[in-house]
From Swiss-Prot:
Protein's job: Transcriptional regulator.
Record has DNA-binding as a keyword: yes
Coiled-coil region list: none
A Pfam family the protein falls into: NikR_C
GO biological process: response to nickel cation
Annotated positions binding Ni(2+): H88, H99, H101, C107
Co-factor: note: Binds 1 nickel ion per subunit.
Cofactor: Ni(2+)
Family in the record: Belongs to the transcriptional regulatory CopG/NikR family.
Name of the protein in its database record: Putative nickel-responsive regulator
Sequence intervals crossing the membrane: none
Record key words, sorted: DNA-binding, Metal-binding, Nickel, Transcription, Transcription regulation
Matches recorded under InterPro entries: Acetolactate_synth/TF_NikR_C, ACT-like_dom_sf, Arc_rbn_hlx_hlx, CopG, CopG/NikR_regulator, Ni_resp_reg_NikR, Ribbon_hlx_hlx, TF_NikR_Ni-bd_C
Length: 148
């Protein structure tokens, strides 16, 4: 396989699966509205590439980007200030935050982060461990070549 060929032509190849895996694949296609098995397989490969990109990170690579979604009780005393203090103290760059009031008790905040994978994940764990935080999920991202 020539990995240096970066054109955007589509290569057809075959995959052998047990029937139960094929059934599961087809169920996901229907459930998620994919137009074909190929579309689902491409998404699964991209997802794995992002995951591997985060695992293979070197401490000097500060280019990882992620979105941290936090739901918290805004009545929890000083929680908002502690979240801000953690963000300011972190080596991770906070690129943007968005804050919404979900209801009379809960706020949702999205925080777009850039930094090393270790530092970004550390920030997520720190914020997620605060009293009053009900949910903290990190969605990792990665850039792709234009033809991926």
């Amino acid at each position: 396989m020539d990995t240096n060929n970066k054109d955007d032509s589509i290569i057809r190849f075959s995959v052998s699966l047990q029937q139960n895996l094929l059934d599961e694949l087809d169920n996901r296609i229907i459930k998620n509205g994919y137009s074909s098995r190929s579309e689902l397989v491409r998404d699964l490969i991209r997802e794995k590439l992002v995951e591997d990109n985060w695992i293979e990170d070197s401490p000097d690579d500060k280019s990882k980007v992620a979105v941290l979604v936090v739901i918290y009780d805004h009545h929890q005393r000083e929680l908002n200030q502690r979240m801000i203090d953690i963000q300011h103290a972190s080596e991770t760059h906070v690129l943007c935050t968005t804050h919404i009031h979900m209801d009379s008790h809960n706020c949702l905040e999205t925080i777009i982060l850039k930094g090393s994978s270790a530092e970004v994940q550390r920030l997520q764990l720190e914020i997620g461990g605060l009293r009053g935080v009900k949910f903290a999920k990190l969605t990792k991202a990665s850039s792709f070549e234009s033809n991926e």
